[in-house]
Amino acid sequence: METILTINNLTKKFGFLTAVKDLSFTINKGNVYGILGPNGSGKSTTLGIVLNVVNKTSGDFHWFDGNTSTHDALKKVGAIIERPNFYPYMTAYQNLKLVCKIKGVPFSKIDEKLELVKLLDRKDSKFQTFSLGMKQRLAIASALLNDPEILILDEPTNGLDPQGIHQIRSLIQLIASQGTTILLASHLLDEVEKVCTHVVILRKGEKLYSGPVDEMISSHGFLELKAEDTNNLMAFLESKKMFGKIKVEDGLITAFLDEPMDAKSVNKLLFDNGIVLTHLVKRKESLEEQFLQLTDN
């Protein structure tokens, strides 16, 4: 599989603060990668480093085959790191025409990209008349003018209303379906779950998980249990290796499964050991629960 970006032991310090710590992961062609983490986890710093706008402290990264200089590699990259920033008194077409001149791209690309982001009918409207969602879509059109191999987006739906969020997510999926690799930073769990094929989870600059999204959420699930004797039930669950993390809140026990097991089998196991349940529900563990487990201090 063709490699787009390789990051090895990347570290960035701002004085005494370590924003990114010994981070390594690889991005392969054709996938949608999400860097997921709470605010301050190092997502934007990581993107800034690979785009050469933030200097790394140590470690390294390589674009494409590893023999391409960062300067040349970035010609194949489209990126939106800050909020969309165009001349407000110029039309969408005029703004993109200016970008084409800077990037050395033919003007014929403008209508093609405006149509892709569903703004062709507003090509002659001034940027200052656009909604925030439209501004973000215009920024994506701008980033795609040079037909990049990878599109990098930092919090692409931040500040948008539900309709704008849906439009941007649908656009990301459309762009990915056409073969463009995408790397996005987000603190929104459902965003990563809906649009990404792979996820890198960060907390305080450290990688907690890296891999396919579907593998992360294909765990064995968890059980919600209640019994009249909560302490006895807790002691039994803790003695069995098929149960991982166990927590109790207001008499409701949540037990995460380390092995496949259905509710019927659990009920029988407990009954055979003299424990009668008053409540038993098996649930599928969502990306949110996985994320909260990983980032739990």
Identify the function of each model-found stretch.
Residues 200, 293-296:
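Short low-complexity, flexible loop/linker segments enriched in glycine and/or proline
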